[in-house]
Amino acid sequence: MDGVGIAKCLDCVRKTAEEAGSLIYANWRLPKIVNELKQHDIKLKLDVETQQLITRRLLDAYPDFALFGEEGQTGDAKAAYRWVVDPIDGTVNFAFDIPHACVSIALQERTDSGSY
């Protein structure tokens, strides 16, 4: 994986996660706009907005990578690398103002067998 410059990837991810976290924090105590509600899951408008921000930042920096996120996929499904994103990991907690949520971003490398 170091062929992509893992230190550079890590720096990009850190900055992106901090920016996404700032967006989430700015909306912490504001009314939440719910897009979808299920028994054990909730989808907020802010989930979509946060993933859009993350997608822009990561794919601007790494346009040949794919992105697989909780709110949808972008890029070539057969790319050598893909970002895996949960824009608000702990959305239910966040929706109810419980301070246990974060931005989760991982990077996967496609194996020789074609899986991640």
Where are these regions (language model features)?
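N-terminal subdomain of lithium-sensitive/metallo-dependent phosphomonoesterases centered on the IMPase/IPPase/PAP
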Residues: 1-88
